[in-house]
Swiss-Prot record:
Lipid linkage positions (N-palmitoyl cysteine): C22
UniProt-listed Pfam families: LppA (PF16708)
Protein's organism: Mycobacterium tuberculosis (strain ATCC 25618 / H37Rv)
Cellular component, GO annotation: plasma membrane
Main location: membrane
Keyword line: Cell membrane, Lipoprotein, Membrane, Palmitate, Signal
Protein name: Uncharacterized lipoprotein LprP
Superkingdom, natural source: Bacteria
Length: 224
């Protein structure tokens, strides 16, 4: 009996040791700090993206094109602001909540009355090469499934650097919905100087580019 007990204890300890090597800091709490190695991986992703100002200008140009195409093929549609979103976000959304960067979202615009299905097909047909040239791909299906056919109501877009454009047509019961989001990007000035004091981690005010825990450095304190 004692031998069986000792064997069981040893087995349990072995399993515990194995699990300890596999469990990540945020395994049980997805909002917990995932560890310095993972934070550095995410920071390198953001550092490799274009400056925030570059993305803002690209989205401003695309915004003008989107509105022009809607006005061209659906002149009856008028835009209004439905939901106001903060234009200046100090920090980034998940999974980059502990990353040094900034993210901005547009307001949510509604177009009434919505384009007819025929008008919508003309609109998205003209927008398709514009989005492709800007590096976007459709973001209107679940992962693993092909995009919805051209002319489907949802013609939302996504780009590899995290930029998103939500563009969904309505019908005779609801309006067209449109908004965009820059994704997490470093402002150009943050590559040559630290962020303003009020935008640095409260416990790590001496952060500097490239904002890494590993070489070549830039962060020294664990993120909250």
């Amino acid at each position: 009996m004692k031998r069986t007990s000792r064997s069981l204890t040893a087995a349990l300890l072995g399993i515990a040791a194995l699990l300890a090597g596999c469990i990540k800091p945020n395994t049980f709490d997805p909002y917990a700090n995932p560890g310095r190695g993972e934070l550095d991986r995410r920071q390198k992703i953001v550092n490799g993206r274009p400056d925030l100002e570059t993305v803002q200008q690209q989205l401003a140009n695309l915004d003008a094109t989107i509105r022009a195409m809607i006005a061209k093929y659906s002149p009856q549609t008028r835009f209004s602001t439905g939901v106001t979103v903060s234009h200046l976000t100090n920090g980034c959304n998940d999974p980059f909540t502990r990353t040094i960067g900034r993210q901005e979202a547009s307001e949510l615009f509604f177009g009434r009355p919505a384009p007819t299905p025929q008008q919508w097909l003309q609109i998205v047909t003209e927008l398709a090469p514009v989005f492709k040239a800007a590096g976007f791909r459709p973001n209107n299906s679940v992962p693993g499934d092909p995009p919805q056919p051209l002319g489907a109501p949802n013609y939302s877009q996504i780009r590899d650097d995290g930029v998103t454009i939500n563009l969904v047509n309505g019908d005779n019961r609801g309006p067209l919905g449109y908004s965009y989001n820059t994704g997490c990007h470093p402002p150009a000035a943050w590559r040559t100087a630290p962020p303003p004091l009020n935008m640095r981690p409260a416990n790590d005010p001496d952060v500097h580019y490239p904002y890494l825990y590993g070489s070549p450095g830039g962060r020294t304190r664990d993120a909250y």
